[in-house]
């Protein structure tokens, strides 16, 4: 393949399109003056061949190849070579059927280069492959001999000459491939080392960690399964036990309900018995009253009965209240214990909440920092890629980042300067304040001591106030009661005074006859000492007629007392005295009285039986009333009086007197109230007055005590208020005191200085950090300007790292947030439970206080009622002493009735306790049912499995398992599970699979690399063997041609290539020259022309060994004289007929041997070529 035509347009000195045609296929010469552009023709050929070393064509860059660097209006350079390709044996691969091959290369201002093959666009590599296939490798050109090449050959070392032989033999290509193979081996070794490093430093540690995590994860799964199994088992056991408890409680509640029904039935029977006994007692009492000879006030019995009923009712109420109080105390104790337990749990949960919150806030800050870095990196990449900011109105890319960093740095510097100025001002203030501090401290200490003393005094007063009882409402109630009692007492006194004035004639007064006289031995008038029941009021006239004047006799204990009164008692009126120890009387026998009752059909009674009196007064009463009958009608009086079996004096209700002697006394009788009735009324009023006075005195004492307590309470309150006011004034005085303000300001200055000093190092660190960030951004900006691709890759790598870090940290933050919310919810639930218990505690304490108040009021009422019962009992005992038989029967019945009433009370208490027990069972049942519902709600699986709970042969066979051990295992597993749950990696199974695959892949790559390395090593050995053989062959042929050509150029002389002494030819070759018969030791012994001929001979011998289709020689004869130049021209013409030579020369001896001569001239600023 040889040049037929060369077309140059705009290339170097060829401004216009220049066509150089008719090239000789063997020997072409180019000549012209210096600077005419002849060498530019060779440069144009090299340009098309694809030269990359611009220095070879004497240019720095492609723009230098355009005519006048494009400044003359020509902006494009184009060179086309048309090759003769008619010889298929020397045709490029793929172009055997093309008789001509045209190759064009064009460049345009700006550096764009374009290749055309036969008019079609082609890649540079395709063009290079085309030329290399015909031994025209322009980047390692053995066909190109430019100016200076001869000098370069002369200065070559042995190894460099060997390289020329290698190039000629073609083994250089093998060497290059060998070097390439070695480089490939080195890369593979580096890759192996990289893989080993990756395996050693990343994969294996990560695999070790993941295998540990996998083991932990598998253990975690095992624990989770055990925990779930044990949790289900314990939950099922709790559910099973609760279900059994509900059934048991249902049975117990049913039994309690039945027991209550039985007790109520029994209680009803006892109440019926009480009613029967009351009816019997009433009949006996009626009979007793009927038998009484004298009427008495029945109000005492009714009052006593009322008082007894009140006492029974109050006692029962107190017992019930005490029972309720005990139960309330028990409930309060349980509530306090539960509240204390909840407080302990809540403290632990709050501590746990603080810990979880701290972790959550720390991770939240870390997440925000990572998110901020991620968004910043995303914004940076987006703005650098698109030139637009995602934040409207802001700068883009590094400019925005740099602006923000500088703003941050300025903010820190401004803060530092501000803090420095503040610190100076504060230090100045401290210096001014410090001298006054001692006096101010003394003043403040004095005020603080006074405040402490006053505060302690207030606390003591509050403690005293707390221990002082106060009842303002009770005082008001007592005052109202006293007011009413005073009113009742006044009314009773008025009635008594009025009645006493009417009975003034019955008033008996005397003076003590002797010193220390015992007035209790003077009993009183007969009329004053007897009592008359209300049912016998209609018999008061008959009794007055019966007593007659004796009604106003004075009863004394002995006749001596009577004598003393008569002698020294200063009696105001005449009086008959009845001494109890001396009086004798006639008393009707029981037989005569019985006969009288029988004859009169119970319309006659002994007068003595109708009245009431003390037992000690019996002789006197017998003396007055013991021998007279009181009859309801005159007929009955007449019958009994004159009946032989009776023969007793009788008095009718109208006052008629029948005497057995035969006399009859009667007539008009005053129907108004007689003295007996008035005396009975007087006695009743006196008794009422006594009860009211006793109650009044008792309440007055209570009121006095209560007033004292309330006064103490009010005094303490007022004193506390006064002292509290003094304390407030003293505290205000301290707050407003200049000394206090000075110390407060001084301490504030110190605290501010401390904070500022702590902040300044932090600001220095932040300023340094910001400054480093700014420098880094500036470096990044410079790197971005010079290498956008690699910088963008680095930014994207950092972005992916941030994204990966954010993706990894987000679940961690979510877990921390879930932990925090969970613990917070538990705290809120505990707080709610604690608040409910505290409310229950307050309500319970209020109920307890109310019950205590009610019990105190009931006990007070009980004391009052017992006092009333005592008074009434004393009066009734006096009244009913003489009815001991009936009384005994009544007592017996009353005892039986009290027994039944006690049974009733006990029964009611038992029923109440049973009701409480029933309510407790119902509450426990409700709690158990609630717990069951809660378990069912929290555990959906229960509904489908509960039929198997407790069944033998199932997983819920509780009898075959130790549930205590199961609970202990569950208790031990929970903290371990909780701790492992925080430590395990849930993605470890997927991760370890990926890492193991990666490890296998990398180890497979290592095996592949080692296998490839072995192949390369085998190939290199084979290449070395082939290279040595080919190199030796080439050396010997070139050596032979070298000697022959040198002999032609310089007849009679010889030259050869030999290895250095004691070395092989593969270590290098040296030029040895023989001038005449003498071998020169060095080329330095030769003349300049001889050395040039030696170099030319070597070059020509190399060209002859493996001829290329074309050779380009640029003024290789510059250092030779004319004869030697002619020899070279002749040598080329005769010895190198198969190749096309293109030679630039200025010597006629050279180009006269050429078959085609091209003459180059420089005209009008451009080169012109003429063929000759």
UniProtKB/Swiss-Prot annotation:
Its main location: nucleus. Residues 172-204, 258-507, 676-941 form a coiled coil. SUPFAM superfamilies: P-loop containing nucleoside triphosphate hydrolases (SSF52540), Smc hinge domain (SSF75553). GO terms for biological process: cell division; chromatin organization; mitotic chromosome condensation. InterPro entries: P-loop_NTPase, RecF/RecN/SMC_N, SMC, Smc2_ABC, SMC_hinge, SMC_hinge_sf. The keyword Coiled coil applies. GO terms for cellular component: chromatin; chromosome, centromeric core domain; condensed chromosome; condensin complex; cytoplasm; euchromatin; kinetochore; nucleolus. It comes from the Eukaryota. Residues 520-640 form the SMC hinge domain. Signal peptide: none annotated. It holds the Pfam family SMC_hinge. The keyword Coiled coil applies. GO terms for molecular function: ATP binding; ATP hydrolysis activity; chromatin binding; DNA translocase activity. Keywords: ATP-binding, Cell cycle, Cell division, Chromosome, Coiled coil, Cytoplasm, DNA condensation, Mitosis, Nucleotide-binding, Nucleus. ATP binds at residues 32-39. It is found in: Nucleus; Cytoplasm; Chromosome. Central component of the condensin complex, a complex required for conversion of interphase chromatin into mitotic-like condense chromosomes. The condensin complex probably introduces positive supercoils into relaxed DNA in the presence of type I topoisomerases and converts nicked DNA into positive knotted forms in the presence of type II topoisomerases. Belongs to the SMC family. SMC2 subfamily. The flexible SMC hinge domain, which separates the large intramolecular coiled coil regions, allows the heterodimerization with cut3, forming a V-shaped heterodimer. Forms a heterodimer with cut3/smc4. Component of the condensin complex, which contains the cut3 and cut14 heterodimer, and three non smc subunits that probably regulate the complex: cnd1, cnd2 and cnd3. PANTHER family: STRUCTURAL MAINTENANCE OF CHROMOSOMES PROTEIN 3. This is Structural maintenance of chromosomes protein 2. It comes from Schizosaccharomyces pombe (strain 972 / ATCC 24843).
